[in-house]
Amino acid sequence: MIKSSVGGNEGKSKFFDQEKRLERTWNNSNWGKQGIISPVDGDMKIIDIELEKKMTKLEHENKLMKNALYELSRMENNDYAAWVIKVLFGEVAHGAK
C-alpha cells in the first residue's frame, strides 16, 4: 500500500490497490481472447472474454466512483456529493440527513 505523509491522501492508496487487483484478474487468464463455453440459463453459451473484460472494468469504475463520492460526502460533509449519491444510487450517504 502506498503511504503518504501529506494529509488527505489516505483514500487514494486504497483506490489504487483496488485497480491493481482488477488488472491481475485478467492478466492471469489462461484463455486469452477465446470465448469460454459456460452454462447460462441451462444452455451452453460462448462467453466473449473481451466483452466480459469491458463489463468488469465498467462495473469496477462505477464502484470506485461510488466509493469516492461516499468518502467525499463523509470527510468534507459535502451536501452536493450526498445529493449526487442519492440521485445516482438512490441511497443516502453515510452521516447525511
UniProtKB/Swiss-Prot annotation:
Topology term for the membrane: Peripheral membrane protein
Subcellular location: Host membrane
Single GO biological process annotation from the record: DNA replication
Alphabetized UniProt keyword annotations: Coiled coil, DNA replication, Early protein, Host membrane, Membrane, RNA-binding, Viral DNA replication
UniProt GO molecular function: RNA binding
InterPro entries (UniProt xref): Phage_phi-29_Gp1
Lineage: superkingdom: Viruses
Similarity comment text for this entry: Belongs to the phi29likevirus DNA replication protein 1 family.
Free-text domain note: The hydrophobic C-terminus is involved in the association with the host membrane. The coiled coil region is involved assembly into protofilament sheet structures.
Official protein name in the record: DNA replication protein 1
Organism, as annotated: Bacillus phage PZA (Bacteriophage PZA)
